[in-house]
Design a protein with these regions (language model features):
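Vicinal oxygen chelate
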Residues: 1-15, 23-24, 30-125, 132-135
């Protein structure tokens, strides 16, 4: 029997107000590969999904704010997010244009940074912020 690949030691887990739309955006904008999706049979929400961009795996689900202290909320419900992604690419301009065409909001246009090479900053339709960088 083949050994199952271990999960990463640390992976971001996103809460989204519309996880299906977020999955579609990440596929179109960042060529994310969907590894798996579990639909909650009680409510039809995406209870867990796994995606991969390059060598990074990350998770997402629909928000569940109604579950009290165990609840998870989307950036839309919280009025923002406390962190952002750093995505390293070969062509910042092309990656930025592709993400904007897929529905991202451009927060900072592509610029040259002394410490980080070329970079831009985007907000995806789910409210998560991304820095797209060449370094």
């Amino acid at each position: 029997m083949p050994k199952q690949k271990a999960r990463p030691s640390l992976a971001p887990y996103l809460s989204c107000s519309n996880a299906a739309a977020a999955l579609d955006f990440y596929r179109r904008a960042f060529d994310a590969a969907e590894v798996m999706r579990w639909i909650d049979p009680d409510n039809g929400k995406i209870g867990h999904a796994e995606l991969r961009i390059g060598d990074c795996r990350f998770y997402l689900a629909d928000e569940y704010p109604q579950t009290g202290e165990l609840g998870v909320c989307s950036p839309a419900s919280l009025g923002g997010s406390s962190f952002h992604f750093w995505l390293t690419v070969d062509d910042v301009e092309a990656a930025t244009d592709k993400a904007v065409a897929a529905g991202a909001t451009l927060l900072r246009p592509v610029e040259q940074s002394a410490q980080d090479g070329r970079r831009s900053r985007l907000r995806d339709p789910a409210g998560h912020v991304w820095t797209v960088s060449s370094h």
